[in-house]
Amino acid sequence: VMRGTALAEGIGEKLRPLPAMVKCPVLVAKPPISVSTKTVYERLDSLEQPPHPDMDGLLEALQARDLNRIAGSMGNILESVTIPMHPVISQIKDVMVENGAINAMMSGSGPSVFGLFADEATLKQAKRALRESGYAAQIYGTTIYNNRR
């Protein structure tokens, strides 16, 4: 929509442009399950205080173009709801990290997971390991692209 990195605020209706994301290999994996976004948000609303990611740290890391800090600041509060319902999401994250991902996180309400990698060779190793694990039905390697570099 904005042709670049952006922060979604509110319920996703407000977009704020951010510094360009560092170019890096990304592995995306989807397990053979479906997740009800409605159910995830209903359960999230019932939690007392879901854990929130370090947005200030993430914004600083983006500004500094530090991939390790960016990855370390990532977070998705919806994981606290979706992973207990579908543990395979956590298993996919574990395989990615055990095979070299700087970090891995569920995308949106799930079930897809993405991992950030320092190089293509490590991504390929993790892709093989995921394929062998049988946890994911679809596995794709790609690269972060941002034309505002």
Question: PLM features: what roles do these ranges have?
Answer:
Residues 113:
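Catalytic nucleophile-His microenvironment captured as a short glycine-rich beta-strand/loop
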Residues 3, 8-103, 120-121, 127-131, ...:
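Conserved, helical-rich catalytic subdomain that frames metal- and/or nucleotide-binding sites
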